Amino acid sequence: MALVRNNSSNGREPVLSPRSLTSPRGLTSPRPLSVQPTPEPVRPLANFPPSIWADRFISFSLDNSQLEAYANALEEPKEAVKSLITDTTIDANTKLKLIYSVHRLGLSYLYPDEIDAELNKLFEKIDLQYYEQVDLYTIAVQFQVFRHHGYKISSDVFKKFKDSTTGTFTDDVTKDVKGMLSLYESAHLRLHGEDILDEALAFTEAHLKKILTTLEGDLARQVNQVLKRPFHTGMPMVEARLYFITHEEDFSSHESVVKLAKVHFNYLQLQQKEELRLVSQWWKDMQFQQSVPYIRDRVPEIYLWILGLYFEPYYSRARIIATKITLFLVVLDDTYDAYATIDEIRSITDAINRWEISAIDQLPEYIKPFYRILLNEYDDLEKEYSKDGRAFSVHASKQAFQEIARGYLEEAEWLHNGYVATFPEYMKNGLITSAYNVISKSALVGMGAIADEEALAWYETHPKILKASELISRLQDDVMTFQFERKRGQSATGVDAYIKEYNVSEEVAIKELMKMIENAWKDINEGCLKPTEVSVALLTPILNLARMIDVVYKFDDGFTFPGKTLKDYITLLFVSPPPSLEN
């Protein structure tokens, strides 16, 4: 239903009361002034679809005793799996397949030191000669294990599967569906200059699509699932659940792995449903749907997005903080894009830059509650984190929020003036308005000691991996939303700017932007290889933020219209029961 506001833009009808005007000589009073109400400004309403979840997640009630029971139940299988990982009697192939399954099931964070120690030993022993004796599936699995954990295993391990005469992959590869599927997964970990993996990606994708209709059972589901979204570009929690469902034969021989995965899924679902309840209740209490009803009401979707950055139990507080700040961003973005006039946008931007409660007087009435809540939340965070000397992280998040407000204003001025920016101009501002900087900085706030001032200083240098993830955030969004934005008459996206800058067709522009995204993924892959500049714990949210952009925007604007991918993901993680512990 269209969101139509009959009140004036500042929430109050301008009223002028006629005064009794009497002439100084006592003559008859003049006629009362005819007062015309100030017309409601034309607003760029987007009529966003309403939430598909309403208050569903508020009703959840956490059973703390059950959560504690799951925590206790984790200990036995956790120790058993640790013993498997460190078992010196297990051969290299079995050990690497075990680590592969542990990683795919989202359990590797439980054993960072043990896995690293084992991979160090194995990486030193294994060479190209060893791989001459191994099949494609095994090689591809081991390639993924090493690359996912930062080891630069050579892509030359796949050379033996190419025809020396034609230079293409052999027919034998097409007959090995599991091997081909694993090679396809491996190709997404490619670096710049790894032509063999570029070729492998195109080759395996074409052949897997060709044979998909001939496959049955789990193998058909595996191929369909991976063609839709490879593990490397997926949301870790969702990929773990899907792997458990469709790849049980990979790990079913290890009873302790199966048990650990089941208990882990049950524990995480309880914890995460409670977090979702907390942010949903907070959102309702803040009454944003009453004060700013034109915005996208997307609490579960934003929580899912942040969960995609880090799902580990010890980041619970971090997720709640980052979810709230990202919801603030949604309010700001939709206010600038889908409601405020240019004069109101200028006033709001100025107030956010001033960041003081006295600035509220200059704001239109409808946005005042938001501004007050925004300042209060940040003030509470600053007090909370000043106690352990971490207020610097809150300041960084606040500065990023102020920066994005200025970026949104820049876009609004372009639209107001009918200006289509050059592509370099667009990208400079577009990387800011992608919201990447705000989300990534806000994600640091609750991460604890690992996200210290040195880590923040590294962020501020804008390293290549950060730039790459940021670029993906901007361009993947643009490619999927530019038509919707055009229809609404909104500011030009990267697609429009590229068309204008290089005088090319829409098709060519999209193709070139997708190439830029592809190269950015290679930069991310390189940035995750050892030796890394900072802790892997800091790199992982950067990688995962790029993954979540792919999840949300690969096929459509999944955030504005969340009834497809995000609905399925939310259902899987927070509605459907996790694997039963009874069997």
Swiss-Prot record:
GO terms for biological process: diterpenoid biosynthetic process; farnesyl diphosphate metabolic process. Keywords: Lyase, Magnesium, Metal-binding. Mg(2+) 1 binds at D333, D337. Its cofactor is Mg(2+). InterPro entries: Isoprenoid_synthase_dom_sf, Terpene_cyclase-like_1_C, Terpene_cyclase_plant_C1, Terpene_synth_N, Terpene_synth_N_sf, Terpene_synthase-like, Terpene_synthase_metal-bd, Terpenoid_cyclase/PrenylTrfase. Optimum pH is 6.8. It is an enzyme of class 4 (lyase). It catalyses: (2E,6E)-farnesyl diphosphate = (+)-(R)-germacrene A + diphosphate. Belongs to the terpene synthase family. Involved in sesquiterpene lactone biosynthesis. Produces exclusively (+)-germacrene A. This is Germacrene A synthase long form. It comes from Cichorium intybus. The lineage of its organism: Eukaryota, Viridiplantae, Streptophyta, Embryophyta, Tracheophyta.
